Amino acid sequence: MKIAITDANIFIDLIKLQWLGYLFCIDIEIYTTLEVINELIDDQLERVTIFIQSRQLNIYSFSSSELEQIMQMAAPAALTMQDKSVVFLAKNIQAGVLSGDNPLRKFCAKQNLEVK
């Protein structure tokens, strides 16, 4: 099964469209990072938590040394810590990235990561 890492942009857009459940109907194992989850506001987090509890959404929590590597990652200024955490995880587990964020998409492409 393919693995994809999502950013907050995907969750926010799908929640606004009331399509979040469809993300978990595709044949892809979905991961995100704790940093991305912490970026969501309460209402968004409540909707995403259902998929965390049902183990359809996997949350990766970085070690302190991994967080240090993420902070030191050379990346465009437009990328947040959360964005860089998505790239770091995708590289480490050889996964694709799901994002609608243009700066993140461009950076992923430069890193030879599959991005949709």
Residue ranges and their predicted role:
Residues K2-A95, N102-K106, Q111-L113:
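Active-site-proximal, substrate-binding regions of enzyme catalytic domains
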